[in-house]
Amino acid sequence: MRSIYCGQVNEAHAGQTITLCGWVHRRRDLGGLIFIDMRDREGIVQVFFDPDKPDAFALASELRGEFCIQVSGVVRTRPDSQRNSDMATGAIEVFAHELTIINRAEPLPLDFNQVNSEEQRLKFRYLDLRRPEMAKYLKTRAKASAFVRRFMDEHGFLDIETPMLTKATPEGARDYLVPSRVHKGKFYALPQSPQLFKQLLMMSGFDRYYQIVKCFRDEDLRADRQPEFTQIDVETSFMTAPQVRELMEEMIRNLWQHVLAVDLGDFPVMTFDEAMRRFGSDKPDLRLPMELVDVADLLTAVEFAVFAGPANDPKGRVAALKVPGGAELSRKQIDEYTKFVGIYGAKGLAWMKVNEAANGIEGVQSPVAKFLSDEIVREILARTGAADGDIIFFGADSKKVVADAIGALRLKVGRDLGLMENSWKPLWVIDFPMFEEDSEGGLAAMHHPFTAPSNLGPSELKANPLSAYANAYDMVINGYEVGGGSVRIHNSEMQATVFDILGITPAEQRLKFGFLLDALKYGTPPHAGLAFGLDRLSMLLTGTDNIRDVIAFPKTTAAACLMTDAPSFANQAQMSELAIATTVKGDE
């Protein structure tokens, strides 16, 4: 029906007769001529109708926004005075000879010329996706996916599918459960990741595996999370962690070059401990030239319990954050930041404005200065590198609260004051703790329970699990964790030890993971891998800050689809066939 896309017509086609299919983006009548901007997924082109072609002209007078049409006509170059540099096709226009109205459109519930509510956009997603901006997002995602498939194929990886209906495993979030009709009372789980299946593929001899796969997690949502999401899932045998990182870094560097023509350069490597100490986050945004600086050793003897308490507590921390130019902040703004850090558990926010750094305590303005000596103030200024016109914020609490609160404050103040560099800052974060304490006083795996420790045997790990580091690695770009992985446990004794530490009884181990423990007994190769979030990568590549923009039919933050009204109640016949009942009625 078409010979070319609207957005692909250019001066090289001048004089040619072409056929276009698409939608009326805009219509206007000018001096006896009718002009339309005609749109398809590749872009927009101007088409005009002249009374010299009376049939097409008469029909064009009926055109309205979003009519689906077919146009045949001749490509003409525009006079210099009429060229539109804002359009990729702005040097040409199409003189229409024939027009077919394929389908008319009722008045739209969305207005493409203004900002529509998120609710309306999701309810009428099939219309929202017609917008050129949305088409650009999904085309970029498709381009990224195609590149990844080529790269993986060229490097010897096999695209192997793993099951969607599987068994529930503890991976940190709730599972989506699917009732079995055949096995009444039993449930499948939709996979949170293909983790165990890809490890089993390594045991099966498929030493380089990948797939671009849907995963499901029933967890609280936010701007960069969805209940169903897409992973670029990778696993390898006989490769070390540095080798895996090197290969995957090459893929991401080449992806950025392919899609954005940007050279990311070599990725720096930072330990988890360093990232938390300097930035208060295990996914630091390095575009912001501000760091947390330890000052506890200066404050152990001050007569100010807010500082002295954490400074003398092995589990406490006092950190300073210098904000360039921050002395201009008003008291009202500082009070707002004090409320902000309270969200993260901080009980307050001490501050120090630097008016004349050379004058030490006489050159600063701070409600806590009266508790400090001139020597201490000068050392704080020296350590933070503070200059005239800066402000220093202090976090004094447990290490976790200081990291969470001042780490978040760093990002918020940096954005508010426009201190964020317009650049790409990727890095690897490595050497994560193997375990962390959970809310009930037990231990939880920081990544997942199949991650191998770094250079520890089972007995050493069991003796002191909280001091163990995992052979794990995350890739971070501009403050987003875009991928994470690890070297996996490849012997049954170590795997059973990790399960023991996590409080999984031998009986539970057999029930939930018996197949894995058995498989580990039959010549398992060393293996490692990782998974990238394709949605998150696409979000970065397109420049949007909302992951829903790069997913064709996303869910809301309440995990609902406004367009199809999912989830919905099942009828009683379906429930009976599945031998299940619910305590919630359909009208509640």
Swiss-Prot record:
The keyword Transferase does not apply. L-aspartate binds at E171, R217, H447, R488. The keyword Membrane does not apply. It catalyses: tRNA(Asp) + L-aspartate + ATP = L-aspartyl-tRNA(Asp) + AMP + diphosphate. GO terms for biological process: aspartyl-tRNA aminoacylation. CDD domains: AspRS_core (cd00777), EcAspRS_like_N (cd04317). Its EC number is 6.1.1.12. One of its GO terms (molecular function) is nucleic acid binding. Keywords: Aminoacyl-tRNA synthetase, ATP-binding, Cytoplasm, Ligase, Nucleotide-binding, Protein biosynthesis. It comes from the Bacteria. Catalyzes the attachment of L-aspartate to tRNA(Asp) in a two-step reaction: L-aspartate is first activated by ATP to form Asp-AMP and then transferred to the acceptor end of tRNA(Asp). Homodimer. NCBIfam families: aspS_bact, PRK00476.1. This is Aspartate--tRNA ligase.
